């Protein structure tokens, strides 16, 4: 059994179970949890009561976007280097840290929305209240989102668009899917 993240391919060519969706031939996790290959399902991990994991510079984190404005997205970090944390930590993704290229054209509202699950890299311990994060790599960005219009789950179709099964498309800074084969 392995820890899996939302948007991660967990199996191929089998029926999907709880906490997963089928996309073509792939089974994709819809939540952070433990993958059970016998049931093709993802269950929620129990938070370890004495987890002392803290984000460090270079840590890969999973976070939920809590609010956005023109300059930054504020997130709540709940997973650090594949370990669920007991408490959430606050993080900030500044507009200049969203993409590696075309930094002057990036708009926070076209990259993230409240409720999105984001994979990010800790670049600084921040200002005492928030960790500073970046999504300026191909493997970093939104990994799970729901449409703000329809409420449906969305999947990445390219590096800057996510789409629902019904075809509705929204802009996001999408993370490249992690394919375990």
Curated annotation (Swiss-Prot):
InterPro entries: Csl4 (IPR039771), EXOSC1_C (IPR019495), NA-bd_OB-fold (IPR012340), S1_domain (IPR003029). GO terms for molecular function: RNA binding. Keywords: Cytoplasm, Exosome, Nucleus, RNA-binding, rRNA processing. Gene3D superfamilies: 2.40.50.100, Nucleic acid-binding proteins. Pfam families: EXOSC1. Component of the RNA exosome complex. Specifically part of the catalytically inactive RNA exosome core complex (Exo-9) which may associate with the catalytic subunits rrp6 and dis3 in cytoplasmic- and nuclear-specific RNA exosome complex forms. Exo-9 is formed by a hexameric base ring of RNase PH domain-containing subunits and a cap ring consisting of csl4, rrp4 and rrp40. GO terms for cellular component: chromatin; cytoplasm; cytoplasmic exosome (RNase complex); cytosol; exosome (RNase complex); nuclear exosome (RNase complex); nucleolus; nucleus. Residues 58-137 form the S1 motif domain. Belongs to the CSL4 family. This is Exosome complex component csl4. It is found in: Nucleus, Nucleolus; Cytoplasm. SMART domains: S1. One of its GO terms (biological process) is nuclear mRNA surveillance. Non-catalytic component of the RNA exosome complex which has 3'->5' exoribonuclease activity and participates in a multitude of cellular RNA processing and degradation events. In the nucleus, the RNA exosome complex is involved in proper maturation of stable RNA species such as rRNA, snRNA and snoRNA, in the elimination of RNA processing by-products and non-coding 'pervasive' transcripts, such as antisense RNA species and cryptic unstable transcripts (CUTs), and of mRNAs with processing defects, thereby limiting or excluding their export to the cytoplasm.
